Amino acid sequence: MNKLELMKTANEVRKGIVTAVHSAKSGHPGGSLSAADIYTYLYFEEMNIDPKDPKKADRDRFVLSKGHTAPGYYSTLAHRGFFPVEDLTTLRKVGSYLQGHPDMKHIPGVDMSSGSLGQGISAAVGMAISAKLSNDDYRVYTLLGDGEIQEGQVWEASMLAGHRKLDNLVVIVDNNNLQIDGKITDVNSPYPIDKKFEAFNFHVINIDGNDFDQIEAAFKEARKTKGVPTAIIAKTIKGKGVSFMEDQAGWHGKAPNDEQYAQAMEELEKAGEALCQK
């Protein structure tokens, strides 16, 4: 995909996020929207995957460590062809396979169940070690929230990743600077994030996580990096793409009402139309 196609796809992913959360009347739109560009690049450009064969042995693995932002993950998987886009409206409903957190047993394309913050990166490190032990060449990607990295388990896993020189592992931090209680700098600041990962022997890349040029360059650089794992610190805007949700901690974990949903979809439709004019 070229940059324009990626931007159009990310806009569709964002529409899916808003639709899913509105339908469920609960969920986490803010962090899903902030990471939509990263999800899109991973699943439509970067990763070796096949929606027709989700469990193929040589596929790249992805672990959503910040599992509460499942709406963004699900919308990406649906638009990539793992399951019908129409199923997004069943989010969190009784009997639906699309529950509030990713479930590897029931959702095509999900490599690891997640939800308890800090655990996803540990699973990703284990997958990367497994690949090394088996001489497999698949790569492992994991997406964390910047509030999540307040968890001590994140740094235990990072210590091991650096020690084992896991150059097949890419850790992405969605650095939107907001969590449910407000700014991460006010709650329990993890800054400087880059220096912490560097201390654990990571190659660190700082980018604008809502800019496809920078996203592409970062993942290409990560592929060229040998002997150490890579951490991509992606500065993003929480709620990106919906004006009244942007940079607002209050949209961490609530659904838009009917009026707000209509406004959000109108904005995203206009954004899509503008992209089609380019």
Which ranges hold each PLM region?
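Thiamine diphosphate
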Residues: 109, 113-116, 121-224
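N-terminal capping segment at the start of a domain
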Residues: 10-26, 174-176
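Glycine/aspartate-rich loop-and-adjacent alpha/beta segment that forms the canonical ThDP
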Residues: 212-278
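Short acidic, glycine/serine/threonine-rich loops at helix termini
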Residues: 74-75, 103, 153-155, 181-185, ...
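N-terminal hydrophobic or amphipathic helices/low-complexity stretches enriched
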Residues: 1-13
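Short secondary-structure boundary/capping segments
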Residues: 80, 187, 246-250
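Cofactor-binding active-site loop characterized by glycine-rich and histidine/acidic residues
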Residues: 17-21, 32-163
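Glycine-rich beta-alpha junction loops
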Residues: 68-69, 73, 176-177, 211, ...
